[in-house]
A protein has these predicted regions:
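Extended, non-catalytic subsegments within catalytic or DNA/protein-binding/adaptor domains
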Residues: 3-350
Length: 350
C-alpha cells in the first residue's frame, strides 16, 4: 500500500484507533503481507501472492503468527511504538523465557518490515532492556535428550512385537529418522517419489530443507542393516503393508486402524516418539522430541569414530558448531580432563 494512501486511511480512522487498521483484515492472521501489483488478471495477482508467501518458511510463519497473537492478547497493537514494546516485555519478563520474548520482538520486527513501517524493536532502549531481562531471568536452553543405539534397539524390538499398521509405520519412521538424521519437517514431507531402492540400500531425496530453502535438493543414503535394525527393510515392509504406491509415506492412521490420505503433522512425530518411549519404560520421556533422534545420531556416530564430515553430510548441517556441540555433549565423560587426571595422577598411587 503506497504511503500516501496509508496516510489517508490513517487520517480517516484517527478518531478511533488508527493502529487497529493493520490487524483488522488479512494481516491479522498472516505475518507476511505484501502489496500485490494491480492486475486485470486476478490469477497473476494470486500467483504472485503465493510466491511471496513462500519467501518465508511455513514453520517460521506459524511461529511468528503465534507470537503476534500473544502480543495482541496482552493488549498490544500494531503498528507498535517503542513504549508499547517496553511495557509488553517488562510485563512478560517474569513469566516468559527471555528467548521467547526475543522471538516475539523478531516477529514484530518482521511485521513492521513487511508493512514498510519503521521498526520499533531496534531502538537502544529496547535492546538494553532485553539484555537486562536476559541477565536477570536467563535460563539454560532446554535441549532434547539424545537417543542412543540401545534406545533405538529397544524401541524397534517393541514395535516388531506388535501386530498392527501403526507399529509398522512407527518402526519405519523411527529407523528412517534416526539413521537418516532427518528433521521432522523433512521426514513428514517424504513421498514415494523421493525414494529409490538400490542394491546397497535406500536413497532418499530431500527436495527442500531448513538449510536448503531454495530447493537445490540433497540425497541421503541409508544402507541395509541386520535382521533387527534395518531402515531399508522397515520402510519396505511399511509401504507394502499400507499399500502406499505414491504420495506421502508417513500418514495418519485413525482409531479404527485405517490409513488416511494426509501426512503426519509436526506434532504427531513428537507424540509418536514420546508414546513409544513411555511404552519402552524410559524415564526421560519428558525430555524427548523428534530432535532426540537427530541429535542422537550425531552423538552416537561420533562415539563409534565416524568422520565429522560424514556426520555433517548425513544430517545436512551447515554449521560446524552445531554438530560439534552434539558430539561434545556425548563425549563429556569419554574425553574428560578430570577423568584423565584421576586415572593417571591418583589411581596409580599405592
Amino acid at each position: 500500500m503506497p504511503y500516501q494512501i496509508r496516510k489517508f486511511i490513517f487520517s480517516i480512522f484517527s478518531l478511533q484507533n488508527p493502529r487497529s487498521l493493520y490487524m483488522n483484515a488479512e494481516s491479522k492472521n498472516n505475518i507476511v503481507i505484501f502489496d500485490v501489483a494491480t492486475s486485470n488478471d486476478k490469477s497473476i495477482a494470486k500467483t504472485q501472492q503465493f510466491y511471496l508467501s513462500k519467501a518465508t518458511a511455513d514453520n517460521t510463519r506459524r511461529t511468528y503468527q503465534a507470537a503476534i497473537r500473544q502480543f495482541e492478547a496482552a493488549g498490544g497493537l500494531l503498528p507498535a511504538t517503542e513504549q508499547d514494546l517496553i511495557l509488553y516485555i517488562t510485563a512478560k519478563a517474569p513469566v516468559l523465557n527471555p528467548r521467547t520474548l526475543s522471538l516475539h520482538l523478531t516477529a514484530i520486527s518482521h511485521w513492521h518490515c513487511y508493512q514498510q513501517l519503521p521498526d520499533p524493536t531496534q531502538t537502544i532502549q529496547i535492546r538494553k532492556l532485553l539484555k537486562g531481562i536476559f541477565r536477570s531471568h536467563g535460563k539454560p536452553k532446554r535441549k532434547a535428550k539424545a537417543l542412543h543405539p540401545e534406545h533405538i534397539e529397544k524401541m524397534v524390538t517393541y514395535l516388531q512385537q506388535q501386530n498392527n499398521l501403526k507399529a509398522l509405520r512407527d518402526n519405519a519412521l523411527i529407523q528412517l529418522a534416526y539413521f537418516g538424521a532427518f528433521r521432522r519437517s523433512e521426514l513428514i514431507a517424504i513421498t514415494v517419489e523421493h525414494l529409490r531402492f538400490e542394491t546397497q540400500g535406500l536413497l532418499v531425496l530431500v527436495p527442500m530443507s531448513k538449510t536448503d530453502q531454495e530447493g537445490e535438493g540433497k540425497t541421503k543414503a541409508l544402507p541395509y542393516g541386520n535382521n533387527n535394525i534395518c531402515p531399508v527393510q522397515a520402510v519396505k515392509l511399511w509401504l507394502e503393508a499400507a499399500n502406499i504406491k505414491q504420495g506421502f509415506i508417513f500418514r495418519a492412521i485413525n482409531r479404527w486402524n485405517n490409513l488416511q490420505p494426509e501426512p503426519l503433522n509436526l506434532n504427531s512425530v513428537n507424540k509418536i516418539i514420546k508414546t513409544l518411549a513411555n511404552k519402552c519404560g524410559f524415564d526421560f520421556v519428558a525430555d524427548l522430541s523428534s530432535h532426540s533422534l537427530r541429535r542422537g545420531f550425531a552423538t552416537s556416530a561420533a562415539n563409534v569414530g565416524t568422520d565429522f564430515e560424514w556426520i555433517k553430510r548425513q544430517g545436512g548441517w551447515k554449521n560446524d558448531a552445531t554438530v560439534r556441540e552434539y558430539i561434545e555433549e556425548g563425549q563429556l565423560f569419554d574425553k574428560n580432563a578430570a577423568a584423565k587426571l584421576i586415572t593417571f595422577a591418583f589411581n596409580n598411587k599405592e
